[in-house]
């Protein structure tokens, strides 16, 4: 969902190049170790929206590094404000297209990728835009370490069914799957970190579909 343009958010991104990259040239390698100041494992959320999910994770896990990858500059600015307000040194913002994922991160550089409530692109002619289309899966496989995982959540049953089929056809393995995440065991529900969108629709009784999947050994 496209957010209304907020000039202050756009300006904030431009004012803080140390914390947010605005559409960097894919031909120029990003030195993530230098940007974070350490070599801790990196986890990426592709399509971070307003950032509730990724900022919560960053607070919960100071021993990990997180990248919020968001194509909308206004959304990136909103996430950046949360990062700065909360002093989250283990969070970087990348305002860029996920199509360039491999160029931005390199191979075997990432331990986990989060796909939360991605655009379902329901029309058949837009299949290649879905973030669980086979071409995107190939990009995730390239940047993930051998034991790295994709964690995927959606409220769209059609996208979930498509994603299960796409990942299965790609030869991936599933470590966890739920067609009603918020009614799983208490332990699973307590560990779940909600997005803004998820909280809104789950509170209305909308089932949340979820899966965790990995790739076979490279």
From Swiss-Prot:
Q: Which reaction does it catalyse?
A: guanosine(46) in tRNA + S-adenosyl-L-methionine = N(7)-methylguanosine(46) in tRNA + S-adenosyl-L-homocysteine
Ranges of biased composition (kind: Basic and acidic residues): 13-26
UniProt-annotated binding residues for S-adenosyl-L-methionine: 45, 70, 97, 119
Q: What is its EC number?
A: 2.1.1.33
The record's keywords, sorted A to Z, are:
Methyltransferase, S-adenosyl-L-methionine, Transferase, tRNA processing
Pathway, per record: tRNA modification; N(7)-methylguanine-tRNA biosynthesis
Q: Where does substrate bind?
A: 123, 155, 195-198
Tell me the domain of life.
Bacteria
Region entry Disordered, spans:
1-26
* Region annotated Interaction with RNA, chain positions: 125-130
Pfam families named in the record: Methyltransf_4
* GO molecular function terms attached to this record: tRNA (guanine(46)-N7)-methyltransferase activity
Q: Which residues form the active site?
A: 119
EC main group:
transferase
A Gene Ontology cellular component where this protein is annotated is: tRNA methyltransferase complex
**Which cysteines link up through disulfide bonds?**
none
**Function (record text):** Catalyzes the formation of N(7)-methylguanine at position 46 (m7G46) in tRNA.
Task: Say which family it is in.
Answer: Belongs to the class I-like SAM-binding methyltransferase superfamily. TrmB family.
Q: Do you know which PANTHER family this protein is assigned to? A: 3-DEOXY-D-MANNO-OCTULOSONIC-ACID TRANSFERASE/TRNA GUANINE-N 7 - -METHYLTRANSFERASE, PENTACOTRIPEPTIDE-REPEAT REGION OF PRORP DOMAIN-CONTAINING PROTEIN
Under which name does UniProt file this protein?
A: tRNA (guanine-N(7)-)-methyltransferase
Q: Which organism is it from?
A: Lactobacillus delbrueckii subsp. bulgaricus (strain ATCC 11842 / DSM 20081 / BCRC 10696 / JCM 1002 / NBRC 13953 / NCIMB 11778 / NCTC 12712 / WDCM 00102 / Lb 14)
Taxonomically, what lineage is the organism? Bacteria, Bacillati, Bacillota, Bacilli, Lactobacillales
């Amino acid at each position: 969902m496209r957010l209304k343009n907020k000039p202050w958010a756009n300006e904030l991104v431009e004012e803080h190049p140390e914390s947010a990259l605005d559409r960097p040239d894919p031909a120029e390698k990003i030195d993530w170790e230098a940007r974070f100041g350490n070599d801790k494992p990196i986890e990426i959320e592709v399509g971070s929206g307003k950032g509730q999910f990724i900022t919560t994770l960053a607070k919960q896990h100071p021993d990990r590094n997180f990248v919020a990858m968001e194509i909308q500059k206004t959304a990136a600015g909103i996430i950046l404000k949360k990062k700065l307000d909360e002093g989250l040194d283990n969070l970087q913002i990348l305002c860029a297209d996920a199509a360039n994922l491999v160029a931005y991160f390199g191979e075997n550089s990432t331990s986990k990728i989060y796909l939360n409530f991605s655009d379902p692109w329901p029309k058949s002619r837009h299949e290649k835009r879905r973030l669980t289309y086979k071409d995107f899966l190939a990009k995730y496989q390239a940047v993930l370490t051998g034991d790295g995982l994709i964690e995927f959540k959606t409220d769209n049953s059609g996208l979930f069914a498509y994603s299960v089929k796409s990942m299965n056809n790609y030869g991936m393995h599933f470590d966890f799957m739920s067609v009603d995440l918020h009614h799983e065991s208490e332990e699973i529900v307590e560990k779940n970190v909600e997005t803004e969108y998820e909280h809104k629709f789950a509170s209305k009784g909308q089932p949340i579909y979820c899966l965790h999947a990995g790739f076979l050994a490279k």
